[in-house]
């Protein structure tokens, strides 16, 4: 089972709460997190793209780094961990992204991959005059299909003459080409999104569901399998969870309750309003899950709260879900969270014993000695 870290490229990570750690994103912060993640055997690091935040008292995601330049920097200061940036495909031409990806492939010596997103929050793009109108919601996967086909052509052959509804290439060239196969991630939970991933992605990115219900998302894997049976492709799942861990279940749950008590209502209302504007994609999209009123304080991602032992056991449950190749983790406190994962959680995971054998966890007794 692969483990990844979802880099806090935006302020305050993934908690819309006045009671959560408040911090600004920086290269130094992300470098520290990813280097420590690499030390503990994390397999990959992924950063999102966000061009406008949600406001509120915490100014949630109003402050964001840029994903490609950040991950290029991280590629240069790491040696083993896989690095993924995210392409905002509405504002980044595919030929430019193909060349940027090839460059980071060179920096990382073949450790780079790409997450592609269609875009869902209109103000991110309308502020630049680049939102194509709400009719885009109905055709965004057709747009992304053309985009990915061009990427694959350029990476494989260095040249594209692709002609489609949205893009027209005329002897477009990219060289040098990537030295390693470029893996593509796409988030899909609706049937349309899953069908797209089955056709074009290497990994399908989904949200975990609920509080301490680690296997509740498993039905998405079954639906993805339905579509991959039709395409004949092997597409595995990367699933997102937040970890809030402590010495005891009670301590961890108290932190979770505090974050909920301090929820940034204004920022949450912005999220819910924007998430409801796509009326074309159905009720089962990842955006609809993000904007749900059930647990908006951490955008409704699956949440694992408990003692180190309990969290380790729940992560092992996820590892048993057929079709899941990796777990992407966020933490309430990223710096401490990565350390706690490496020292206190991962050594207890049956599914990660091969990784633990490669480094020496420092026991609590040794820490205090």
UniProtKB/Swiss-Prot annotation:
FMN binds at residues 49-50, 115, 124, 140-141, 190. Pfam families: Bac_luciferase. InterPro entries: Luciferase-like_dom (IPR011251), Luciferase-like_sf (IPR036661), Pyrimidine_monooxygenase_RutA (IPR019914), SsuD_RutA_monooxygenase (IPR050172). It catalyses: uracil + FMNH2 + NADH + O2 = (Z)-3-ureidoacrylate + FMN + NAD(+) + H2O + H(+); thymine + FMNH2 + NADH + O2 = (Z)-2-methylureidoacrylate + FMN + NAD(+) + H2O + H(+). It is an enzyme of class 1 (oxidoreductase). CDD domains: Alkanesulfonate_monoxygenase. Keywords: Flavoprotein, FMN, Monooxygenase, NADP, Oxidoreductase. GO terms for molecular function: alkanesulfonate monooxygenase activity; uracil oxygenase activity. One of its GO terms (biological process) is nitrogen utilization. Its EC number is 1.14.99.46. Belongs to the NtaA/SnaA/DszA monooxygenase family. RutA subfamily. The FMN-N(5)-oxide reacts spontaneously with NADH to produce FMN. Requires the flavin reductase RutF to regenerate FMN in vivo. This is Pyrimidine monooxygenase RutA. The gene is rutA.
């Amino acid at each position: 089972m692969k483990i990844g870290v979802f880099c806090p490229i935006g302020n305050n990570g993934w908690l819309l709460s006045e009671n959560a750690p408040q911090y600004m994103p920086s290269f130094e912060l992300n470098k520290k997190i990813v280097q420590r993640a690499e030390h503990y055997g994390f397999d990959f690091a992924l950063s999102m793209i966000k061009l406008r935040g949600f406001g509120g008292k915490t100014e949630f995601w109003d402050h964001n780094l840029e994903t490609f330049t950040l991950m290029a920097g991280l590629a240069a200061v790491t040696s083993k961990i896989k690095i993924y940036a995210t392409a905002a495909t509405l504002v980044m031409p595919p030929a430019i992204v193909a060349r940027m990806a090839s460059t980071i492939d060179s920096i990382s010596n073949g450790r780079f991959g790409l997450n592609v997103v269609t875009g869902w929050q209109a103000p991110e793009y309308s502020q630049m005059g680049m939102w194509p109108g709400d009719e885009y919601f109905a055709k965004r996967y057709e747009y992304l299909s053309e985009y990915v086909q061009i990427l694959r052509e350029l990476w494989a052959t260095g040249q594209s003459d692709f002609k489609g509804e949205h893009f027209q290439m005329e002897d477009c060239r990219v060289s040098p080409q990537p030295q390693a196969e470029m893996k593509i991630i796409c988030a899909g939970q609706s049937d349309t999104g899953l069908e797209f991933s089955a056709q074009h992605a290497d990994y399908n990115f989904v949200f975990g569901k609920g509080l301490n219900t680690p296997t509740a998302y498993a039905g998405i894997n079954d639906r993805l399998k339905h579509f991959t049976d039709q395409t004949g492709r092997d597409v595995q799942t990367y699933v997102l969870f937040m970890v809030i861990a402590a010495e005891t279940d009670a301590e961890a749950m108290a932190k979770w309750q505090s974050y909920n008590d301090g929820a940034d209502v204004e920022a949450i209302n912005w999220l819910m309003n924007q998430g409801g504007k796509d009326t074309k994609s159905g009720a089962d999209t990842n955006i609809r899950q993000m904007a749900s009123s059930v647990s908006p304080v951490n955008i409704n991602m699956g949440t694992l709260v408990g003692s180190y032992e309990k969290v380790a056991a729940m992560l092992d449950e996820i590892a048993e879900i057929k079709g899941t190749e990796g777990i992407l983790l966020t933490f309430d406190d990223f710096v401490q969270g990565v350390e706690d994962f490496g020292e206190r959680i991962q050594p207890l995971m049956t599914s990660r014993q091969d990784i633990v054998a490669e480094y020496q966890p420092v026991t609590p007794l040794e820490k205090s000695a």
